[in-house]
Regions:
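Acidic, polar loop-rich interaction surfaces within structured domains
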Residues: 229-232, 240, 247-250, 254-323, ...
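Conserved functional hotspot residues or short segments at active or partner-binding sites
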Residues: 287-444
Length: 445
């Protein structure tokens, strides 16, 4: 819904074998606000507030699971989940989330300013968080002047940040699953001016370009696009265009890889949705399956290899077509290697990022251990050892940050509203601001 009027719990779900898995949470939605549900949690049961019993949904079709989860506003849904932090499927917990509408203002673009100080010099880094590419099509069709849209909001926020004399801008597209293609084009022209934003190839092989040759650029200063694995579709179009035009840095992880266009046709007894075309960057590469690779990689608190279009059975492959004409802003130059070096130096000094690296290495080791003992006592001992290792890694970081440690693994896994939560996403944003400050210092002075 481009108008961002959603009802339910605000979670994107997918089918993962027998399980319904949480792919991502809608910014500002009931699930995110509850702090009880996370990406990669598996939903194994659903119940209603007045029911004592939880319905087992293992092996169910995803649309049937969604039907159980949805319900009237202000009612409670119970979810039995296997937490993403759990080592196996034997540990579950039941959470309650109150269904609600996702308010437009919760999903609208927001601004902030981060201050980065280097050798006595302060860099004011503007941040615009954009959770979705939204547009009120009804108001647009009525030709209302001030209809709600992401591009209009971002323009206003940029002008406001300019008045506050920012030195550079971060456009935060993390967890932005896309939305209006029209808005992706409009936003691209804010940073690129006129030109092609994306190419579209139909099933019959014809290719056409989307963009605006007369687009008006309103921001021409240092720019960084922040993405993660849940940045998809329109987010990938915008990030890919900025990267191809060499207008700014793209920082984060590989994106989702959703580069196809679907169409819904009405049938006599229902509807059918089918893929009719694919997106291609101006440089010729498809965003399908592969996504957009950042100029500088940042660590991720989740296993990014287990998420994305490439994990779907029968997903269309990545391919290339001929590149189209586009302007080279040449804003990056040879600075990327220096910026990467400075970034890696900071990583070695950060408790949070060192801990993320250690946890990733530990999980890789766990995944590579394919031997399972048939002796029940040995299996229990191995499980307890793994739980203690993960708990030790978590508590090690909490001690370094001066936070209370968890007494046992059960307390760690079942935590819900931790008042001393370690905000990894905020640490990633702060490091992005440091990268942009480096970019300004070495490229724009």
């Amino acid at each position: 819904d481009m108008k961002l009027s959603l009802e339910g719990i605000g979670a994107l779900l997918s089918s993962d074998g027998l399980y319904t898995t949480v792919q991502s949470l809608v910014a500002g939605g009931p699930a995110e606000n509850s702090n009880k549900l996370n990406a990669k949690d598996k939903i194994v049961g659903v119940g209603q507030e007045d029911d004592e019993e939880i319905t087992d949904v293992i092996g169910w079709r995803i649309d049937d699971v969604v039907e159980l989860i949805r319900g009237p506003k202000d009612t409670v849904v119970k979810l039995e989940i296997i937490p993403s932090s759990s080592l196996d499927e034997s540990h579950t917990k039941v959470i309650e989330i109150t269904r609600n509408l996702v308010k437009l203002e919760d999903l609208a673009a927001k601004k902030n300013i981060l201050s980065i100080t280097r050798e006595g010099k302060e860099y004011k880094i503007g941040v615009i968080e954009l959770p979705a590419f939204y547009m009120d099509f009804d108001a647009y069709k009525r030709r209302e002047y001030d209809y709600k849209s992401s591009s209009k909001d971002v323009r206003k926020l940029i002008n406001s940040l300019k008045r506050e004399n920012i030195d550079g801008l971060i456009l935060d597209l993390r967890n932005n699953g896309g939305g209006s293609l029209f808005e992706a084009n409009s936003l691209a022209h804010i940073f690129l001016g006129g030109g092609t934003t994306v190419q579209v190839k139909t099933a019959k092989g014809s290719v056409h370009e989307l963009g605006d040759r007369r687009g008006f650029q309103i921001y021409d200063d240092p720019l960084l696009i922040l993405v993660n694995k849940f940045s998809a579709s329109a987010s990938e179009i915008l990030a890919g265009a900025v990267q191809d035009y060499r207008r700014g840095l793209v920082v984060g992880t590989d994106t989702f890889g959703k580069g196809t266009v679907q169409k819904v046709e009405t049938l006599s007894s229902g509807q059918i949705k089918f893929t009719e075309s694919k997106f291609y960057r101006v440089s010729g590469g498809s965003t399908q399956n592969k996504g957009v690779s950042p100029d500088i990689y940042l660590p991720s608190p989740i296993d990014v290899d287990e998420i994305g279009e490439h994990k779907y059975l029968g997903a269309l492959v990545h391919d290339n077509i001929k590149e189209t004409k586009f302007k080279d802003f040449d804003r990056i130059g040879a600075s990327k290697e220096l910026l990467t070096h400075k970034h890696k130096e900071r990583m070695t000094q950060s408790s949070i990022f060192k801990n993320l690296k250690e946890k990733k290495s530990w999980r890789v080791m766990q995944d590579n251990n394919i031997w399972i003992s048939l002796n029940i006592d040995k299996r229990k001992a191995n499980k307890e050892q793994s739980e203690q290792e993960l708990l030790s890694l978590e508590n090690e970081l909490r001690r370094e940050l001066g936070l209370e440690t968890f007494q046992n693994y059960k307390e760690f896994v079942e935590r819900e509203e931790d008042p001393q939560v370690i905000d990894i996403e905020e640490a990633i944003l702060k490091e992005s601001a440091n990268i942009l400050a480096d970019f300004i210092e070495y490229s724009f002075q």
